[in-house]
Amino acid sequence: MRQFRKIIGAFLVIAITLCTIASCDLLGGKKPEELTATADEILATTPYTVEMLLKYDANDADMLTAMSDVAATEMKLTVDGSNFVGKLALGEENYIIYTFVDGTLYTEWSENGTDVQEKKEITAEDKAGLLAEFGTGLKYTDFSEVEVASAKDVSVITCRNINSDKVAELAAPLQAQLEEVFDDVVVTVYNATLDIELENDSYNVIVLTCEYFITVNGSTSYSVEMTYSMKYSYGKDREIMAPSF
């Protein structure tokens, strides 16, 4: 029983860590603010936005290459809730302006004096992937089976069968915590399900369910299911549900 209590304590530490990640102000939601910084600095403070910029520039490979050179890149970014405007300067004649409003990414850029405009719809699956990545460390592409159910106001994405290359990564935080308590412990994740609910672009619910198999001192084994739940609104408060197991 003492060993089991120590294991549960380690789970709570992991849950608090995930809750801290989920409660971070990813979009500067407290109030609209303007930032002028290098891309790597912005990456550290607004990862959701920068990931959107890097992922959804769908046209110019050279432009993407320049964007990835964070040491030479500067951005000016205005964030307001889930909407943002970003301008990326690449020399005197080349620039990109992104405007992300209500699920649509508008892109305008100038390349050697030629102005180009386009817009791209961001799908529920795309949003879910980014939300999941910053809420739990996983993306929907980390699963081999993905189901999307959409109604008028709600989209629900269910991800099953986690890819084998992510199993060790998912088990690592708990493994590290338990190694501080036990000399000989092995943690294995044999099942994980990620459920993401998006409603009216107003709030999101992310639920990660993990089934762990834990072996202590080579003999005593435990099978534990842990559920991490988090709910938050764009630009508003984040609500973290109590972890359950």
Where are these regions (language model features)?
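Tryptophan-centered short beta-strand motifs
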Residues: 32-35, 113-121, 220-222
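Gly/Pro-enriched, hydrophobic low-complexity segments
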Residues: 153-245
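Flexible, processing/modification-adjacent segments and terminal tails
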Residues: 111-177
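Short, solvent-exposed secondary-structure boundary motifs
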Residues: 61-70, 85-92, 126-142, 177-188
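Sec-dependent N-terminal signal peptides of Gram-positive bacterial secreted proteins and lipoproteins
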Residues: 2-27
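An acidic-aromatic
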Residues: 74-133
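One face of beta-strands
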Residues: 46-56, 68-88, 96, 103-105, ...
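N-terminal leader/targeting segments and the immediate start of mature chains
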Residues: 19-78, 238-245
